[in-house]
Amino acid sequence: MAHKKAGGSSRNGRDSESKRLGVKKFGGEVVIPGNIIVRQRGTQWHPGANVGMGKDHTIFALTTGNVTYRTKSNGRVFVSVMPKTAEAAE
């Protein structure tokens, strides 16, 4: 015969895995082609010069250079890669 009442089971304890979204390379950081700069849902950041955008809106570098962020007058933030000059590379 049981001497303790059976405990109820909790119906909580489920959650989805985090998607690790956000900025991966900040302004001034050096990137090489293929480096992911921003992972996002939708276009919180927009692609500028020397960057591409994947089908999931991921912004990635197309050339080697420094990452820059620029806000236009309409409030949109554009991510660009400023290529390294020949003198700076030597």
Swiss-Prot record:
GO biological process: translation
Alphabetic keyword roster: Ribonucleoprotein, Ribosomal protein
A cellular component term, taken from the record's GO annotations: cytosolic large ribosomal subunit
Pfam families xrefs: Ribosomal_L27
Cysteine disulfide partners in this protein: none
SUPFAM superfamilies assigned: Ribosomal L27 protein-like
Region ranges (Disordered): 1-22
One Gene Ontology MF term: structural constituent of ribosome
Sequence similarity: Belongs to the bacterial ribosomal protein bL27 family.
NCBIfam families noted in UniProt: L27
Protein name per its UniProtKB record: Large ribosomal subunit protein bL27
